[in-house]
A protein has these predicted regions:
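Catalytic histidine-centered segment of alpha/beta-hydrolase-like enzymes
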Residues: 240-253
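Conserved alpha/beta-hydrolase catalytic His-Asp/Glu region
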Residues: 126-130, 144-200
């Protein structure tokens, strides 16, 4: 049986909560805006080494910091430095977590040995930004429950939700525990994130993964980011949306395992 330990650690910017399992080379997991750290649970048993799932700012027991991806990255980097002393782990993020991972590679390169960016980009194009303003308004007026239907249609494809109503129920239960303030602050951070001028500085080898049905961070965003990064490759997963590790755990692991092994 896999043993999972839940912990928290104090950093100069605040407290960070996380869980870990396994031994060996460290792999840090950063969840998306629309999920929590448990969003990687379906694939953790098949991931190599020591796997560390981190709560992003305002999620779990992690303290909220200023609403910028750079500040999010600085908080998580401080935790990683303590959790993985003397090591530059692979950092894998999904959605919000992928932007934080990219921010770590830019601002704290000594703490990132490799990157797996699942649903990411350098910035959001103007047509995509009203979605964040809409989600902010929904949460501020109706709470997390008001944004849950929107979130579900971004996490999964419509066809998958139609065939797996139990997944919608489970995700809805998870999202009900999301702090509305944390959600809104994360949306504000994503509204203004822009790594187009700094992404070229990333020296870590990078795998960019995107579902071809991802409405939150479409394949065009992944390809635009790939054009900026010096050591990256893009993998497009068919018939998957924003959280492929939830929708097709085995297919997701198949897509990333060689990269994680260093190939």
């Amino acid at each position: 049986m896999t043993t999972v330990e839940t912990r928290s650690i104090a950093t100069p910017m605040g407290r960070v909560s996380y869980s870990e399992t396994g031994e060996g080379r460290s792999l840090v997991l950063l969840h998306s805006l629309l999920t929590d750290r448990q969003a990687f649970d379906p694939v953790i048993p098949d991931l190599p080494g020591r796997v560390i799932s981190v709560d992003l700012p305002g999620f779990g027991e992690t303290d909220l910091v200023a609403p910028s991806i750079e500040d999010f990255a600085a908080l998580i980097a401080g935790a990683v430095a303590e959790i993985c002393p003397g090591e530059a782990p692979t950092v894998m993020g999904n959605g919000l977590g992928s932007f934080v991972a990219l921010g770590m590679a830019i601002g704290h390169p000594d703490l990132v040995g490799a990157l797996v960016l699942v649903g990411c980009g350098a910035t959001f194009p103007e047509p995509a930004r009203p979605a964040f303003a809409n989600m902010i308004q929904l949460v501020e007026t109706g709470g997390i429950a008001a944004v849950t239907p929107v979130a579900l249609r971004r996490i999964y494809t419509d066809e998958y939700l139609d065939d797996h109503p139990e997944e919608a129920e489970e995700r809805s239960r998870v999202m009900a525990h999301t702090d509305p303030t944390a959600f809104v602050e994360a949306c504000r951070a994503l509204l203004v994130v822009d790594f187009t001028e700094t992404a070229a500085a990333v020296q870590a080898r990078t795998l960019i993964v995107v579902g071809d049905q991802d409405q939150a961070t479409p394949p065009d965003m992944a390809r635009a980011l790939d054009a900026l990064l010096p050591h990256s490759v893009v993998v497009v997963l068919p018939e998957l949306a924003h959280a492929p590790q939830l929708q097709d755990p085995r297919g997701f692991v198949n897509a990333i395992e060689k990269f994680l092994e260093g190939e």
